[in-house]
Each structure stands twice: as structure tokens, then as C-alpha cells.
Amino acid sequence: MQNSEGGADSPASVALRPAAQPMPASPQRVLVQAAGSTPKGTPMQTLTLPRVQPVPPQVQHVYPAQVQYVEGGDAVYANGAIRAAYAYNPDPQLYAPSSAASYFETPGGTQVTVAASSPPAVPSHGMVGITMDVSGTPIVSGAGAYLIHGGMDGTRHSLAHTARSSPATLEMAIETLQKSEGLAPHKGGLLNSHLQWLLDNYETAEGVSLPRSSLYNHYLRHCQEHKLEPVNAASFGKLIRSVFMGLRTRRLGTRGNSKYHYYGIRLKPDSPLNRLQEDTQYMAMRQQPTHQKPRYRPAQKSDSLGDGSAHSNMHGMPDQAMATQGQHHQQYIDVSHVFPEFPAPDLGSTLLQESVTLHDVKALQLVYRRHCEATLDVVMNLQFQYIEKLWLSFWNCKATSSDSCASLPASDEDPEVTLLPKEKLISLCKCEPILQWMRSCDHILYQTLVETLIPDVLRPVPSSLTQAIRNFAKSLEGWLINAMSGFPQQVIQTKVGVVSAFAQTLRRYTSLNHLAQAARAVLQNTSQINQMLSDLNRVDFANVQEQASWVCQCEESLVQRLEHDFKVTLQQQSSLDQWASWLDNVVTQVLKQHSGSPSFPKAARQFLLKWSFYSSMVIRDLTLRSAASFGSFHLIRLLYDEYMFYLVEHRVAQATGETPIAVMGEFNDLASLSLTLLDKEDIGDGHSSEADVDGRSLGEPLVKRERSDPSHPLQGI
């Protein structure tokens, strides 16, 4: 073997002297090539070494440029990280390695294992390493392998498999890109900076992949931050392949939602880009130009944000990663939803306060419409964090803080965005018709927001978007209460009641969506469906009907038809969309006889109660029989109950001409519940007036009776 020529302290050869005492002759030693991709059956190449004379027992100091065998389990450290001295045992031994680590691949397919040092422990063979100047971390700790020590320069270097191109190859790649893309010669330095960014943030690694669009969007972000002109996606792909040789492309993901991935590359653990990886799913982000304007438009839509510091911070976009992720999520929402017009306030014969004029009412209509449009615009861009600032700026504008707050628009066509002072808003909201008009506008706004964020409750959406919506819903009430501090309690209760119904709707719809995704997997599993059908056929539905008939008083023929249809739909292994269509038909059949009747809302509520009672009886029977598919039935039952609620909610809203938010918000506050509203038809006309009063009193909650009769003493309640 040839030794390296560099290194002043590395001798060109090792002189071996015979020992004083004779020793048996040693046969020739054979080194088997450690690794290679040679097909099975092909004889392995052997390297025959001349016979070695025995050596005296003294230690010979051997420096890099040698071959060493390392047993499995022994640690190996990076080249140059340790200096070692070895003692050689002349006993004839032959080692056959079982595996070897790959350092680089040659065109011929052979693999060479390069290492640098001996382990600190004493291996079982005759090569004993005496460790000195230990530094670094082990690089080989698997099964035994031959390690070729030393290098041309004797310097320390990493043994990691990088597969990076040489500087000459990179220069050729830059020249090729300049010619193919028609780039000016002075942009060679720009490409060099792009290459350096790639080398600083990415590394090759086997068995991992990275979405191609994510890598390109990281690059766009880098160019935007450093005011660089980016190359297009195709040129960027050529640039990557010139840096990381042998990079492969794969299409990964579910059918219909697959993305191209670079296979064999990953972010470095210390790269700042790791902070952008907030989503566990694939973040195939949209490409955007570096000069894109902020999507939030506070000046045009929402009024100024009070002080200039808050305004500038919002334009600074410190959380651009969140904005980029939001752009990816926008494909799951309905950004084309049309915002309905608001009704005009019905003042009737209401007398306005002296400080409020009709001009103030018209100004409120214009300003509140613009405020709601700004809210919709922010939500469409999934910039939920700006909602609190919008509400604060609208409800807490001081008359002396800016000219926009002090002045009012002269006409509806006035393009100037203005805010009403807080004192003026309080005076306007004290007028009951104005407050009810604002409540109706909120119903329209929040229903539009719901249909924008969750256009289809059964459609799969990323879990990160679902969680963002739930966090948004959790914060709404606190944001509004904080923004409206100082307003009359009645105004706050009215506003918070509507926003509470909005938040509850978001929570219900996201939970329904989560159940739908979990149930979709069950409905697509043939073995689970067969087990469910087998367990369902063992249920004694006659006994279920007998127990439930007294409570629900349903027609037996209707119950039997629903049972038969359910089993048939289950046997056909229907998809989730087909089940949704079946549930919709059930609601239509049951509520058809009440269509156009004032009792439609009550009939819809009764149907929900009966459906839930029957399904609970079936689940009870499955539980008592220890059905194997109980878990699947429980999940399906939860989904169908929630979806029935969703369908009935929309049917009632359609029948009453209200929005679903208004329907659910009607009974959100316990004070609005009364026996008179819920069961008017159950109260007979023959009751005396005193009994009628007692019935109303008993039907009303204590809070409402106290509010309706201020003179009523608390002790009497």
C-alpha cells in the first residue's frame, strides 16, 4: 500500500525489525475489500500483502496512513479528532467484515469506508489503540469494518456523507445557468450568494424528503429579506441539483393531494428555517413576488389603528411565516363569498337623544359597514391576530386623538375612512332600535365568516387550520369585552351574545369536521363495516322500539323504514358523502309535514331529541352484547348526531328567514328561554289570568324575571 506524502510527522513507511526470540512463520495475510455493490456470486477482490516479519514487543508509533479493523460496538471518531499509537500482535488472524459505512460512491459502484482513529477501548484483536488528544464524537458504532486511516493533508475533516459538488463543478453550474437563463455576467455573484444560502441551511440525508415548493418558498423568503432578485422555480431546481449531486424527486402524498418532494435532503438542525416548520403536514406554499403588499389593509377598510407604532408594526410583518402558511390554507376556505347588504335601521317613532341626529345614524351605517368589511377581509386572509386591533380601534376612538375620529362623513359616497368617537358610539347604542340593527348586522357578518372559514363541514382540512380556527373562537369574547370596556352593560351583553354564538358555531363545525375525518377511515374499512353489520343484525330492534315508543311516540313504520335503510346503506359500504345524503333525506322526510308551519322549529327540535334517544338505545344494546364494533358505532353515532344538528339548524334558519347564527343565538342566553316561547301551543286558553301569570313566571328564569320587573325584590325571587 502507498502512504500519504504530506505530513511532516508521518513516516513514509514503517520499519519492522525481527524480535530477539524466534517465532513461527506467519502466513500471508489477506485483506478483503470492505464494501461494494458487487452482485452475489461474483468472487470478491482480494489484496494480497507480503509476509510480515515478527516484531519485538516494544511499541511502534504509527501515524495516519494505515489500515485498521474495528470490532462491532467499538466507537470510531472523526478524522483528526484523535491521535493514537498502536501495538501490533504478530499472531496470524484473518478478519471478514460484515458491513461498512458509505463515505462516497464512485462511478463503478464501489464504496470505500474512511475513518480516522481507534476506539478508546481495547478490542479483542491484536491492534491496540492508545488514545491521546481525544476530541470529537463517534462516527462508526455498528458491526465490524475495515477503516482506512489518514489523508493527503493530515488535517481534520468530517466524514459525513455530503455528496456536495466540488468548487469547479459549482463554477461550471453557474456558467451553465447564466447561459441557459440568459443571465447577465454580473449576476454570477448573486448566484454565488444563493449557493451559499443553500449550503448554510440544507444538507443531504438518506431516507428523508422535503417538499419542493417549501424549499423554493424558503428561498423566496430569503431573497425578500435580503432584497435579492430570485430566479424562477425551474432555475432554482437546477441550482439545487448542481449543489447536491444525486438528488432525486418523488411525488408523495395522498391521491389528489400529492406534492413533489426532493428525496435525500433536509434542513440542517441549526438552520433558522426550522422555526418556519410549524405545520406537521406538507406546507406547499404559494409562490409570491418579493414586492407583494401586506394583505391587511387597515387604512382602506378598517380605520387607522390609533397610534402610529401599532400601525407600523403591522406593516413590518414580523410573523411572515404565519402569513405564508395562511396563504397555503386559503385554498380550503371560500374567499369568493359575497358579503350581503345590511338592512336599514328601523327607528319608527323612537325619539333620539339630543346629542344624536339622523346624520349620526347615517354615519354609523357607513362606518359600521366599512368596519365589518375590514373584519371580513382580515378573516379571509386568515390574519386572526388583527381582529382585536380592529375592534379596539373602532370602539375606542377618542375625539381628540385624530381628525378622522372627530369628523363625520358628509355623505355615503365620501371615500374618507372615518371613525366615530367613543362618546358618540355610546350615545347611538343606547337607542334600542340602533342596538337591534347592529345585532342583525352582526348576525349577517358572523354567518358570512362561518361560511368563509368552513364552506364544507365534511371536507378534509389541515389540522393546523382547524386548530387556528378554534384558537380564534376561544379568543373572540375576551377581545370584544376588552374593546368595549366603558360601554353600557346592555350593549356589551348584546354584542357578546352574538359573538358567543359565532364562537360556539366555529367550535361545533370544527369538531364536526374532525369527526368526519375520523369516521371516513372507518367507513372505508371493509372488515370494520362487515363487523358492524354483523353486530347490528344481532340488535333486538323490537325491544328498542318498545322501550322508546312511550317516550318518543314515533310511528312504528317510520322507525322500521329508517332501520332498513340504515342497514342497506351500511351493507353497500357507502362513502361519507353518501351517508350525508341519506341523513339529509331523513331530515326532509320527517320535517316535510311541518313545512311552512309556525311549529316547524319545535318539530325540528323534537326530531333531534328523538333521534338522539333512539341512537342511544341502540348503542346501549350493543354495549350489553359486548359488540366488537362498539367503538366504530360510537364514532359513527357521534358524527351522525352532530351532522343532524347541523342539518336541522340550517332547515330552521331557512324556514324562519334567519341566519343559522341568529337561530342558535336566540337560545344562547338562558334569559331568552321561556315556557311561552318554547311551548306556546301547550298552554290552554281556558286558564285564568292568574294561572297564566304564574305559568309565565315559572317558565322564566330568575334572571329574566328580575330584569323584567325591577321592583321585584330579590328575596321574593
Curated annotation (Swiss-Prot):
Primary role: Transcription factor that acts as a key regulator of spermatogenesis. Acts by regulating expression of genes required for the haploid phase during spermiogenesis, such as genes required for cilium assembly and function. Recognizes and binds the X-box, a regulatory motif with DNA sequence 5'-GTNRCC(0-3N)RGYAAC-3' present on promoters. Probably activates transcription of the testis-specific histone gene H1-6.
Lineage: Eukaryota, Metazoa, Chordata, Craniata, Vertebrata
Keyword Transcription regulation among record annotations: yes
CC annotations in GO: cytoplasm; nucleus
A Pfam family matched in the record: RFX_DNA_binding
UniProt KW Plastid keyword: no
Inactivation phenotype: Mice are perfectly viable but show complete male sterility. Spermatogenesis proceeds normally through meiosis. However, haploid cells undergo a complete arrest in spermatid development before spermatid elongation. Arrested cells show altered Golgi apparatus organization, leading to a deficit in the generation of a spreading acrosomal cap from proacrosomal vesicles and merge to form giant multinucleated cells released to the epididymis. Spermatids also completely fail to form the flagellar axoneme.
Subcellular locations according to the entry: Nucleus; Cytoplasm
Signal peptide, first to last residue: none
Basic and acidic residues bias locations: 685-710
Sites of Phosphoserine modification: 26, 411
Designated gene of the protein: Rfx2
Keywords of the record: Cilium biogenesis/degradation, Cytoplasm, Differentiation, DNA-binding, Nucleus, Phosphoprotein, Spermatogenesis, Transcription, Transcription regulation
Record text on subunit structure and interactions: Homodimer; probably only forms homodimers in testis. Heterodimer; heterodimerizes with RFX1 and RFX3.
PANTHER family recorded: DNA-BINDING PROTEIN RFX2, RFX TRANSCRIPTION FACTOR FAMILY
Protein name as annotated: DNA-binding protein RFX2
GO molecular function term, any single one: RNA polymerase II cis-regulatory region sequence-specific DNA binding
